Amino acid sequence: MSLMDPLANALNHISNCENVGKNTAYLKPASKLIGRVLKVMQDQGYIGNFEYIEDGKAGVYKVTLIGQINKCGAVKPRFAVKNQEFEKFEKRYLPAKGFGLLIVSTPKGLMTHDEAKDSGIGGRLISYIY
């Protein structure tokens, strides 16, 4: 049986590993989208280092956890969001204003919702983290 949503599976695995108190998480299968989401999470200080490990199949990401994640998950369906509509989705997915972030796929690549607001562009919601 094939995996339906690798990104949702990876984010759920990270959240579960954080709840249990593990220091590392191994995300399999690896993809470019998962790597870009991990890069945004690393830039914002939610995870430590991560590395791609080739296993002869789909690859694995080894993620170092630093205990900063309360919850993270994928947004399904991937809503199209205009620049002015981010606040509506902040209320829906984040516990408080200014706490946590939404990861958005824009024409300029993956970025946080704050960066997208500052750039004046919209996109599709990929995931949330706080």
From Swiss-Prot:
Gene Ontology MF, one: structural constituent of ribosome
Gene Ontology terms: biological process: translation
Gene3D superfamilies linked: 3.30.1370.30, 3.30.1490.10
Keyword RNA-binding annotated: yes
UniProt keywords, alphabetically: Ribonucleoprotein, Ribosomal protein, RNA-binding, rRNA-binding
HAMAP family named in the record: Ribosomal_uS8_A
Subunit description: Part of the 30S ribosomal subunit.
Annotated function: One of the primary rRNA binding proteins, it binds directly to 16S rRNA central domain where it helps coordinate assembly of the platform of the 30S subunit.
Protein name per Swiss-Prot or TrEMBL: Small ribosomal subunit protein uS8
Organism placement in taxonomy: Archaea, Methanobacteriati, Methanobacteriota, Methanomada group, Methanococci
